[in-house]
């Protein structure tokens, strides 16, 4: 389970970097910055998210319980909300958060998050947080 979550974090971080390089306007709109190039703000945003991902990676590697539960809840709830939000954005009901490819990518990430969250829940029932039999529920 740890490797799946770490893999997702790696893909998420690489995606953030790729979006910054290819379509930095997405960062600008997420941070509600005026039109123009804001490289320092974008790099600060990437740095803050990178620090959060790094902390979560350390927590996964050390099998910290709080990171298990935080990741589980974020993946189940966040992922479940991303999917219908993306559908509503594509249907024109909600204003789009970016180009169509970005909205579709968000929906795909939501689907992957929910799937990983369900796998984490099943692993918890079987062998405890992070598939650690010592911490398995009795």
How should these model regions be labeled?
Residues 1-138:
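Topology signature of small-to-medium multi-pass alpha-helical membrane proteins
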